[in-house]
Curated annotation (Swiss-Prot):
This is Trans-aconitate 2-methyltransferase. Transmembrane segments: none annotated. GO terms for biological process: methylation. One of its GO terms (molecular function) is trans-aconitate 2-methyltransferase activity. Catalyzes the S-adenosylmethionine monomethyl esterification of trans-aconitate. Gene3D superfamilies: S-adenosyl-L-methionine-dependent methyltransferases, Vaccinia Virus protein VP39. The gene is tam. NCBIfam families: PRK01683.1. Belongs to the methyltransferase superfamily. Tam family. Keywords: Cytoplasm, Methyltransferase, S-adenosyl-L-methionine, Transferase.
Length: 256
């Protein structure tokens, strides 16, 4: 997959940052020595961490060069590194691991979550939020269009870019033996957007990328036209003309 686009992602910065704020509010660590923002993106979540813990050494970690470029422009005093969390280990004395909307992209992510919790010192925290929206029309329709001609050959594997998330009980059973406390919850957002085209713009920043990146300009235009038409049918306008993008997310905070 091509690099992520920070510009596209930030078109809905307020809406994308809200889950990070709500996750952070449930982290009880008062004075961490070091904090790592895993999947920091363009630095919007990192900024929250710096504001919450100005005395801590906060680093951002991401695989995207474009996201990291934007993060460094936003927070020039902070350290950002390019790394894949599947092969990355936190620096010693890291007391908070914060991961907003990243682990859904990591294969076998439960294994890595267990590794990260196990490496925390007593009182440290792993805080995670992941979109749980593969069964929403926005994502069902991506796959539906991709499995049709003329895109089937190129996009047959795109639907495999993200696995369905396990049930909350699976996370609980895997992580609870490794920590002193585990909080886990779901939140369903209903984001108010202008129209179906705005929903498409939203998912172009993240979930739609594996479907459109393999296509050339002409193919991409045709795919997006077919997808947008189905999104418009699945998300009818409200009385004022706006549409509601239903967006479930799972959260958990593990305290060592």
């Amino acid at each position: 997959m091509a690099d992520w686009s920070a510009e596209q992602y930030l078109k809905f910065e307020d809406e994308r940052t809200r889950p990070a704020r709500e996750l952070l509010a449930q982290v009880p660590v008062l004075a961490p020595r070091k904090v790592a923002d895993i999947g920091c993106g363009p630095g919007n979540s990192t900024e929250l961490l710096v504001e919450r813990w100005p005395q801590a050494a906060v680093i951002g970690v991401d695989t995207s060069a474009d996201m990291l470029r934007q993060a460094r422009e936003r927070l020039p005093q902070q350290k950002f590194i390019e790394a894949n969390v599947a092969h990355w280990a936190p620096p010693p004395d890291t007391d908070v691991l914060f991961a907003n909307a990243v682990f859904q992209w990591v294969p076998d992510h439960l294994k890595h979550l267990k590794r990260l919790v196990s490496g925390l010192e007593t009182g440290g925290a792993l805080a995670v939020q992941m979109p749980d929206n593969l069964d929403e029309p926005s994502h069902i329709l991506m796959r539906e269009v991709a499995f049709e001609e003329p895109w089937r050959h190129q996009l047959s594997k795109a639907a495999e870019s993200r696995d369905m998330l396990p049930k909350p009980g699976v996370y609980y059973d895997a992580l609870r033996p490794l920590c002193s406390r585990l909080e886990i919850w779901h939140t369903v957002y209903n984001h108010v957007l202008d129209d179906a085209a705005a929903i498409v713009e939203w998912v172009k920043g993240t979930g739609l990328r594996p479907f459109i990146d393999p296509l050339d300009l002409h193919e991409r235009k045709a795919y997006l036209a077919a997808y947008t038409a189905r999104v418009a049918a699945a998300y009818p306008p409200q009385a004022d003309g706006k549409v509601l993008l239903r967006f479930p997310r799972i959260f958990f905070v593990a305290i060592k």
